[in-house]
């Protein structure tokens, strides 16, 4: 246990930030799962508006990832890797 007042405050701050970071990560993971679901639905039954749904969902996922980077939840290189993997899946489907 912390002995000084500043160390006690620091523990509270760290715990608050940890919970916040977990929430941001959860949101990003949720939207990635939604994107992958849209992709799988399109591969099972291709239709004209499926591509539009994929593109809009991909844009939303990119936004969520970028906001997580801005808030310091993810490193920019990790975000770039995540976005690259998602774009690769889209490009494979598009061909």
Swiss-Prot record:
Which ranges form a coiled coil?
A: none
Work out whether the entry's keyword set contains Ribosomal protein: yes
> What does the UniProt entry say about where the protein is found?
Plastid, Cyanelle
Species this chain originates from: Cyanophora paradoxa
What the entry lists under InterPro entries is as follows: Ribosomal_bS20, Ribosomal_bS20_sf
What one GO molecular function would you report for this record?
Answer: structural constituent of ribosome
Q: What is this protein called?
A: Small ribosomal subunit protein bS20c
Protein function: Binds directly to 16S ribosomal RNA.
Q: Which family does it belong to?
A: Belongs to the bacterial ribosomal protein bS20 family.
Q: Which GO terms describe its cellular component?
A: cyanelle; cytosol; small ribosomal subunit
Q: Which domain of life is it from?
A: Eukaryota
Organism phylogeny: Eukaryota, Glaucocystophyceae, Cyanophoraceae, Cyanophora
Keyword Secreted assigned: no
Q: Which cysteines are joined by disulfide bonds?
A: none
Q: Which UniProt keywords are listed?
A: Cyanelle, Plastid, Ribonucleoprotein, Ribosomal protein, RNA-binding, rRNA-binding
BP terms from Gene Ontology:
translation
């Amino acid at each position: 246990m912390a002995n000084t007042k500043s160390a006690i405050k620091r523990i509270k701050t760290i715990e608050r930030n940890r919970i916040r970071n977990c929430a941001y990560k959860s949101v990003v993971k949720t939207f990635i799962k939604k994107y992958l679901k849209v992709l799988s639905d399109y591969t099972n039954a291709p239709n004209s508006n499926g591509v539009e749904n994929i593109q809009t969902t991909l844009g939303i996922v990119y936004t969520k990832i970028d906001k997580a980077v801005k808030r310091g939840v993810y490193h920019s290189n990790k975000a770039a890797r995540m976005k690259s993997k998602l774009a690769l899946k889209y490009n494979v489907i598009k061909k």
